[in-house]
């Protein structure tokens, strides 16, 4: 299917038109409420700038966190509005409606005052429980209010790749009502992930980490037939080690997944690669003393928090021969300096082979956060995705509601 994109919309003309843009501005916040990683704000800028320069009036919908029972001051988009305004070089008005919903009467009045080249950010769209409702009519009602904001001549641009796997009002339902287009970010993500699934240059190496096998099972099964090797690290590797009959001490373990892991190891023995040594400790705290042990000899009473140095060397050698690499999930608890070496080593190996011409994609979420936490430049890999869950579901071959709807026939506008 062909998905209309921002270029199509700009060719139609947006000067004087109101455009609703769904961005992913779900940034991490520190204890003081300050943004600790601006990656998603920065990624939203190209689409917004293109529309502003073309004279559009922009209404941005976005969320922050998972508010329960309505508005939560701790999850206000106020710091996001300030950061976005700084990056765009212009004022970004945050609409704080007196209604419980971000699309209440105040929002409509603010939109009516917009002039060409203005941008307005709605308050956290998830403050309205209809955004994430499982009831179609409830989501559709909110979508219709969003359409009312931009009017019958308006358009919808989907540029929040991190939420396209969600069937939510501002992601899916609004696209059934307005002419819809993929923003620059979403179009790029689709193009790159499609390359990983259908035309990846071999050898193709996949690096998977994170805590749970259950979170990565689908992508392991999907990519095991496409990749030449799949490196497994992070907390999920201990369930695979247990499936081989090894003791894993107090390490993270999904006992209900052991048989599944055993089956995967039997079926894809020539593809799956496990660590040979593990950095273990007694307690899950940053200053708990580390020691390195063989992966098949983790002592009782100790837990693994990182892959060991021999594993890093082995994985780095494997990656050095790859032409295509996809990485999702850290190799250990990189937030603890004593247990960050595995993630750093693998990341540096990916950066090195990228510098020699390999095509590398780093999945969103913790992997992207690790790159930044370890002070590795974003430009040192070919593509740093903004969507963790969305990237994985796409690679699994699942239908992503927010992408599927963009490929549908265009509605006639806000009155359809």
UniProtKB/Swiss-Prot annotation:
ATP binds at residues 216, 304, 335, 364-367. Pathway: Carbohydrate degradation; glycolysis; pyruvate from D-glyceraldehyde 3-phosphate: step 2/5. It comes from the Bacteria. It is found in: Cytoplasm. It holds the Pfam family PGK. Its EC number is 2.7.2.3. Substrate binds at residues 24-26, 40, 63-66, 126, 166. It catalyses: (2R)-3-phosphoglycerate + ATP = (2R)-3-phospho-glyceroyl phosphate + ADP. GO terms for biological process: gluconeogenesis; glycolytic process. GO terms for cellular component: cytosol. SUPFAM superfamilies: Phosphoglycerate kinase (SSF53748). Gene3D superfamilies: Phosphoglycerate kinase, N-terminal domain. PROSITE patterns: PGLYCERATE_KINASE. Its main location: cytoplasm. Keywords: ATP-binding, Cytoplasm, Glycolysis, Kinase, Nucleotide-binding, Transferase. One of its GO terms (molecular function) is ATP binding. It is an enzyme of class 2 (transferase). Monomer. Belongs to the phosphoglycerate kinase family. This is Phosphoglycerate kinase. It comes from Mycobacterium leprae (strain TN). The gene is pgk.
